[in-house]
């Protein structure tokens, strides 16, 4: 039997008898430990040898023997808990301790900086698993950030100013409006050791052609080593930014044959995935990264939904609960929570119904019904971006005839959506409208793969906003279902850099197709000893650029 299993058995005994010495029998102990009398005798011998207890046996069946505890079960439990924490076995820790509040405090005490075996380790607490890290698929906000740490594109978009920077390619040029050339760095390696080949780039980009944003790519070739040519059906001013977006990250061409690639992907980025399961994501600095090696050696993201649900709205937590004075940064998101009206729905495609719903469901009406801790993090939205005021207040018209029931759909693992849907239910019920709630996984929501009148979601944009605002929404199949046919004309104007984003956004809002609700305050909590931390528009920070000052500094 392993030491950990023996410790658990001892703790069960200690808890059963409250640490008090007692007279008992082998049969009674067998019932406590749910095993045979013979096995109990073996366990007692091992526990006695470890110095945890003294077992003074009396000969004969049914004879009462003396059980004397020499070690506190609490002390042993604490020792074992510390070992599990050190080994990042959070699931086993929850089973061992049992008390969720106690586990939470233990975890919070270990957040932030750790120094082990010569390595700098950053520990983060998060509220849900990060199970899909495959570029080119439906990625939520935090998955998008992680993918940027694991992969590279031909170009990179600077998170702070939106400027285009070299990445896998060191230079690029437009030979003609329909022909772009990228010059790649040599000797770039994937995390599994193989050198990047031009065929990896070609396969990574051609796999994206079926997607709306990439449908104008005609062909990708490599005329000579370390050169990639991209041919287009129509000109695209934004192509270099598009090839630096998270969808266009470069994968090894054999990615489909790699086991569980969406969860444990292989890239060329500054961090490689060591472990990714439902309770932990661990990434490690890649020593053969072609850029500057990351300064933090390892990032551990502990996932405990039942212990960290409030992180849905409070932000990324790198330190214990007493960090009010240690908040690193906060910002109002570039994006919003919103309602989309599905044009496939007979009710949602009716302008009068959409107008009436938007007049009823105002940000102020929702905030007035929200709990105080939500009010702290929500700011009323009157446009897609905080600086835009496109949603004009109008007088409430009478309810359209025949409107008695609506279906609202949102994605799971997001407690704020539950709160918003409850408020919407109350507002509509007061008007005689029943609201049916439908919850999907994120991929089905992203695809719009359900019948619904209204869709509840959120979008986070990044710099440059002229690129990301349209790109983020247009690449979403759900939006293709919900918006009018004009969207397909808008893509050409956007690619020509003639689409004015403020006007485009105002059109969607004024036509009651896209209804902004809130802008969210993003907050990053952590230690002031951390340096190089700049919160990005996704509420995270670039791991490879962060570092710790020595404790005495």
Curated annotation (Swiss-Prot):
Q: Does the keyword RNA-binding apply?
A: no
Task: Extract the signal peptide range.
Answer: none
**Ranges of the DNA-binding region feature:** 26-49
Q: Taxonomically, which superkingdom?
A: Bacteria
What GO biological process term is on the record, naming one?
Answer: negative regulation of DNA-templated transcription
SUPFAM superfamilies cross-referenced by the UniProt entry: Periplasmic binding protein-like II (SSF53850), Winged helix' DNA-binding domain (SSF46785)
CDD domains of this UniProt entry? PBP2_SgrR_like
Q: Does the keyword Amino-acid biosynthesis apply?
A: no
Annotated region (Solute-binding) at 163-494
* Single Gene Ontology MF annotation: DNA binding
**Keywords noted in UniProt:** Activator, DNA-binding, Repressor, Transcription, Transcription regulation
- Ranges for domain HTH marR-type: 1-113
A single Pfam family it belongs to is: SgrR_N
Task: Outline what the protein does.
Answer: Activates the small RNA gene sgrS under glucose-phosphate stress conditions as well as yfdZ. Represses its own transcription under both stress and non-stress conditions. Might act as a sensor of the intracellular accumulation of phosphoglucose by binding these molecules in its C-terminal solute-binding domain.
Q: What is this protein called?
A: HTH-type transcriptional regulator SgrR
Species of provenance: Yersinia pestis
Its gene is sgrR
């Amino acid at each position: 039997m392993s030491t950990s299993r023996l410790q658990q058995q001892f703790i069960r005994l200690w808890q059963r008898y409250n640490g008090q010495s007692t007279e008992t029998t082998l049969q009674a102990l067998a019932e406590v430990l749910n095993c045979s009398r013979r096995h109990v005798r073996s366990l007692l011998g091992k526990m006695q040898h470890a110095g945890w207890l003294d077992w003074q046996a009396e000969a004969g069946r049914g004879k009462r023997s003396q059980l004397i505890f020499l070690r506190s079960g609490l002390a042993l439990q604490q020792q074992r808990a510390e070992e599990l924490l050190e080994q990042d076995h959070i699931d086993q820790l929850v089973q061992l301790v049992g008390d969720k509040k106690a586990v939470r405090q233990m975890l919070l005490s270990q957040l932030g900086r750790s120094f082990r075996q010569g390595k700098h380790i950053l520990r983060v607490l998060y509220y849900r698993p990060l199970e899909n890290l495959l570029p080119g698929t439906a990625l939520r906000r935090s998955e998008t950030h992680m993918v940027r740490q694991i992969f590279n594109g031909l170009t990179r978009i600077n998170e702070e100013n939106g400027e285009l920077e070299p990445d896998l390619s060191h230079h690029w040029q437009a030979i003609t409006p329909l022909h772009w050339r990228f010059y790649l760095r040599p000797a770039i390696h994937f995390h599994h050791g193989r050198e990047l080949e031009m065929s990896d780039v070609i396969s990574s980009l051609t796999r994206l052609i079926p997607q709306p944003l990439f449908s104008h790519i005609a062909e990708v070739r490599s005329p000579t080593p370390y050169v990639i040519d991209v041919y287009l059906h129509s000109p695209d001013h934004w192509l270099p930014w598009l090839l630096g977006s998270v969808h266009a990250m470069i994968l090894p061409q054999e990615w489909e044959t790699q086991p569980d690639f969406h969860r444990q992907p292989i890239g060329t980025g500054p961090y490689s995935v060591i472990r990714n399961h439902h309770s932990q994501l661990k990434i490690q600095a890649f020593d053969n990264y072609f850029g500057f090696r990351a300064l933090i050696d390892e990032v551990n993201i502990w996932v405990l939904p039942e212990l960290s649900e409030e992180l849905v709205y409070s932000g990324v937590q790198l330190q214990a609960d007493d960090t009010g004075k240690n908040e690193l940064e906060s910002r109002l998101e570039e994006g919003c929570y919103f309602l989309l009206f599905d044009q496939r729905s007979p009710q949602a495609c009716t302008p009068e119904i959409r107008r009436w719903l938007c007049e009823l469901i105002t940000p102020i009406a929702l905030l007035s019904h929200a709990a105080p801790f939500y009010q702290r993090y929500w700011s009323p939205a009157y446009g897609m971006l905080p600086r835009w005021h496109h949603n004009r207040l109008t007088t409430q018209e009478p309810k359209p005839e025949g409107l008695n029931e609506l279906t609202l759909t949102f994605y799971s693992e997001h407690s704020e959506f539950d709160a918003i849907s409850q408020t919407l239910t109350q507002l509509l019920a007061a008007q005689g409208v029943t609201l049916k709630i439908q919850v999907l996984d994120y991929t089905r929501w992203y695809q719009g793969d359900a019948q619904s009148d209204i869709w509840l979601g959120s979008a986070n944009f990044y710099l440059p906003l002229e690129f990301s605002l349209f790109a983020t929404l247009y690449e979403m199949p759900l939006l293709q279902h919900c918006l009018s046919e004009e969207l397909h004309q808008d893509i050409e104007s956007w690619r020509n850099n003639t689409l004015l984003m403020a006007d485009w956004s105002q059109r969607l809002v004024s036509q009651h197709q896209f209804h902004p609700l809130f802008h969210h305050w993003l907050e990053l909590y952590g230690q002031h000893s951390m340096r190089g931390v700049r919160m990005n528009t996704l509420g995270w920070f670039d791991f490879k650029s962060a570092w710790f000052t020595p404790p005495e500094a």
